[in-house]
UniProtKB/Swiss-Prot annotation:
UniProt-listed InterPro entries: RNase_HII, RNase_HII/HIII, RNase_HII/HIII_dom, RNaseH-like_sf, RNaseH_sf
UniProtKB keywords: Cytoplasm, Endonuclease, Hydrolase, Manganese, Metal-binding, Nuclease
Name the record gives this protein: Ribonuclease HII
Designated gene of the protein: rnhB
NCBIfam families: PRK00015.1-3
Length: 181
């Protein structure tokens, strides 16, 4: 069994960093449609996410902005990956993570693959479901904090988001260790 792990929300200034771990139950027929979540349209991501969730074992983990501020985004991303894998509770022959760094995971083999979210099906799948999950969370936060445009900016430091911070102030879910304005 191969497990792919990726995270989303590293560059955001609002909310958690979120990771997903994915193991396909069998080889699905839609693998050729997978790609890095950033390269797919919202509609395509949501469609593929539903297929992935039906055809894979998966787990999510998020690390709050407070913890990000305490341990930094790099360590928080690795921790999210570690927890997502642990939540799967399935032993894998090979764990593949997107990026340069390996989280603290007990596995027979583990490898970090730069641009893995564009090359490895399991990492692509993790990228997609993590992005869809975090985007849904931002839509929910937008209902609570409509002045910050979270539905549109997804917590990233857009001009509109930074202008909203200048005008309305920093929220408890903003990452204080990041340059907010």
């Amino acid at each position: 069994m191969i497990c792919g792990i990726d995270e989303v929300g590293r560059g955001c200034i609002f909310g958690p960093v979120l990771s997903a771990a994915v193991i396909f139950k069998t080889k699905p027929n839609f693998l050729n449609e997978l790609d890095d979540s950033k390269k797919l349209t919202k509609t395509k991501r949501e469609y593929l996410s539903s297929l992935i969730l039906e055809n894979a074992y998966y787990a999510f983990a998020d690390i709050s902005n407070e913890i990000i501020d305490k341990i930094n985004i790099h360590n928080a991303s690795l921790l999210a990956m570690q927890i997502a894998y642990q939540k799967l509770n399935i032993e894998c022959n090979l764990v593949l993570v997107d990026g340069k760094f390996i989280p603290k995971i007990q596995a027979k083999q583990i490898r970090a693959i730069i641009k893995g979210d564009s090359m490895i099906d399991e990492i692509k799948a993790a990228s997609i479901i993590a992005k869809v999950q975090r985007d849904k969370l931002m839509v929910e936060y937008d209902k609570i904090y409509p002045l910050y445009g979270l539905k549109k900016n997804k917590g990233y430091p857009t001009k509109e988001h930074k202008d909203a911070i200048k005008k309305h102030g920093i929220l408890s879910l903003h990452r204080k260790s990041f340059r907010l304005i």
